[in-house]
UniProtKB/Swiss-Prot annotation:
GO MF entry, a single one: acetyl-CoA C-acyltransferase activity
Principal location: cytoplasm
Source taxon at top rank: Bacteria
Record family assignment: Belongs to the thiolase-like superfamily. Thiolase family.
Region forming the signal peptide: none
Name listed for the protein in its UniProt record: 3-ketoacyl-CoA thiolase
Catalytic activity of the protein: an acyl-CoA + acetyl-CoA = a 3-oxoacyl-CoA + CoA
Keyword Transferase: yes
Pfam families: Thiolase_C (PF02803), Thiolase_N (PF00108)
GO cellular component: cytoplasm
Keyword line: Acyltransferase, Cytoplasm, Fatty acid metabolism, Lipid degradation, Lipid metabolism, Transferase
């Protein structure tokens, strides 16, 4: 068992919603803030602690407008019936937003600026489109290629640079769905998914506790039949090898080790290290490589020490490129064992805490000790978190 110092940052618990399709999906009548509040209530109900001690609720969200606007973090505090004395903020590091929420809370705990934090993230891509209201600076093209704003083209670039062809991408995508559906059937998501009321295709209310985006019938023949979507003439990236558009939320409970101990709560993991890094916007998907290298160095570890990995699958070409860059290409049996974003979707602000929660559950299922959660970020960034079970 890991010996903990008083100001070590521990993960007490983590939950998420099921992932809903963004187009006419099960959460089409559920707001992003309401979905998030349901998770906060569940997190509080699952763990015995005084909510008056919560310092801050930190929520990741990318497109902060419409129902996701006006500091959705504070709105979630009020909707979840937390005490009015609990603060709330919203953070944005694009795809890495809710992992940044982890890092922000962890930094505050480590520096004695609070003992208990609720963090998480949400994105309702069906209600608030990824590019809704976006007005990019025309002068930006003087500083980086305009195509860098098109995530699919950055994936095409990585695929070409790393020799990852269409066949390999298709196989990776099919495997993501296979793993996710197997995890669903075997109940491996039960500890992390909180059922939230939504609607079925006929408009009847249902409890949504199974990921709607997974395709149980995913197969190579169907994937091969699809045309490239971003580079029609010579491309390799298709809709099936890209992360699905989905709606979802995630939440985690972080504490100082000393406060968790005083409350009699058993931590599930301790955060060993954290890092962010920048890279060329044209290959934004490569960001997890420098971010992970930084995080490992800070933890005094090497890639060989990592036993379980959750890598956000923005695209198959991107995920495979990162695995090559990190020396994990031949170790895909420790990466995304319950499937990844190609099967589950990538609700932007939700994904960081989602993959960290999934990582924690997979580590418990596999009885591994040290794990890595990492993801790429649009316009050329990466973020990484190393955790250790306690």
């Amino acid at each position: 068992m890991t010996n903990l110092n008083p100001r070590d940052v521990v993960i007490v618990d983590g939950v998420r919603s099921a992932m809903g399709k963004s187009k006419n999906g099960m959460f089409r009548n559920v707001r992003a803030d309401s979905l998030s509040a349901e998770l906060v209530r569940a997190l509080v109900a699952r763990n015995q602690f005084d909510v008056n001690e919560v310092e801050d609720l930190i929520w990741g969200c990318v497109n902060q407008t419409l129902e996701q606007g006006m500091n959705i973090g504070r709105n979630i505090v009020l909707l979840a019936d937390l005490p009015k004395t609990v603060a709330g903020q919203t953070v944005n590091r694009l795809c890495g937003s809710s992992m940044q929420a982890i890092h922000t809370a962890a930094a505050q705990i480590a520096t004695n600026q609070g003992d208990i934090f609720i963090i998480g993230g949400v994105e309702h891509m069906g209600h608030v489109g990824m590019m809704h209201g976006i007005d990019l600076n025309p002068e930006a093209s003087k500083h980086y290629a305009k195509a860098s704003n098109m995530m699919g083209l950055t994936a095409e670039m990585l695929g070409r640079m790393n020799g990852i062809g269409r066949e390999e991408q298709d196989a990776f995508g099919v495997e993501s769905h296979r793993r996710a559906w197997a995890a669903t059937q075997e109940g491996r998501f039960k500890n992390e998914i909180v059922g939230v009321e939504g609607h079925d295709a006929n408009g009847f209310k249902i409890l949504c506790d199974i990921d709607e985006v997974i395709r149980p019938d995913a197969n190579l023949e169907a994937f091969k039949a699809l045309r490239p979507v971003f580079d029609p003439k010579g491309g390799t990236v298709t809709a099936a090898t890209s992360s699905a558009l989905s709606d979802g939320a995630s939440a985690m409970l972080l504490m100082s080790a000393e406060r968790a101990q005083a409350l009699g709560l058993k931590p599930r993991a301790v955060i060993r290290s954290m890092a962010v890094a920048g890279c060329d916007a044209a290959i934004m998907g490569y960001g997890p490589v420098p971010a992970t290298q930084k995080a490992l160095k800070r933890a005094g570890l090497s890639v060989a020490d990592i036993q379980t990995v959750e890598l956000n699958e923005a695209f198959a070409a991107q995920g495979l490129s990162v695995l090559k860059g990190l020396g994990l290409y031949e170790k895909q049996d420790i990466v995304n064992l319950n499937g990844g974003a190609i099967a589950l979707g990538h609700p932007l602000g939700c994904s960081g805490a989602r993959i960290t929660t999934t990582l924690l559950n997979v580590m418990e299922q596999q009885d591994t000790q040290i794990g890595l959660a990492t993801m790429c970020i649009g316009l050329g960034q990466g973020i990484a978190t190393v955790i250790e079970r306690v």
